Amino acid sequence: MSDTRMLAAALANRSAHAVLGIVSAVDPSNHAIKVRIQPDNVETGWIPDVGGVQAGNLRVSCPSEPGTHVALLPLEGDGEHLIAIGAVFDTVVTAPVSPSDGQAIQPGSMLIRAGCGAPPTETNGKVGDVNPQAGWCQIGSDGVILGAGNARLHIAESGISLTIGDVTAAFSANGLKVSGGDIQTDQHSLTQHVHLMGSQTTGGPVG
């Protein structure tokens, strides 16, 4: 008599189930990918890449990159028809840190950051170089922060601040304040302009 536990285990192993794989090719125009299923490294055909997607009147597209670790789910239990349901972090491609404070993003917040370094396409490869000029967006309890390179825009309940290098422009209920730089038009400078008094000129602005 066969052990029913062995039969159940054999049946479970024959049933299609969620698997992990590594993206091997990308077709951005059709939002499709090929994936090498682990651990056997068998490559799929072109399958839908739905990670980070919204389809409809509002559309969001974030194609996976070669080397991305993705989770695959069989459609209607058919192991020959898979769909990528999302990407996962691993020990090589780790969660990004916030350029705002250098910490991993915490629950209740969201971070979108480009230029973190492309995933390795080989098993012994390394993550690509980080691009410090790439854009990022962080949403949290302290407002919304947009950044790229050394520029940063912070929208909070108390006001809006724009920082580029050492220059900051802060707009709040008290007005607009600029620190660390000058305010200029195409013809005049606030800190360096003077006024004519007959044939003489005044000094620079005071206060």
Model-predicted segments: where are they?
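Short, structured beta-strand/loop micro-motifs enriched in basic residues and often containing a Trp
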Residues: 47-55
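Structural detector for short beta-strands of small beta-barrel domains
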Residues: 15-29
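Flexible glycine/proline-rich, aromatic-decorated loop/lid segments
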Residues: 39-46
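Short boundary/loop segments of OB/S1/cold-shock single-stranded nucleic-acid-binding domains
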Residues: 1-19
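Right-handed beta-helix
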Residues: 2-4, 65-68, 81-207
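Short aromatic-glycine-enriched beta-strand elements
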Residues: 29-35
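Short nucleic-acid-contacting surface segments enriched for D/E, G, S/T with interspersed K/R
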Residues: 56-70
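Short, surface-exposed secondary-structure boundary micro-motifs
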Residues: 73-75
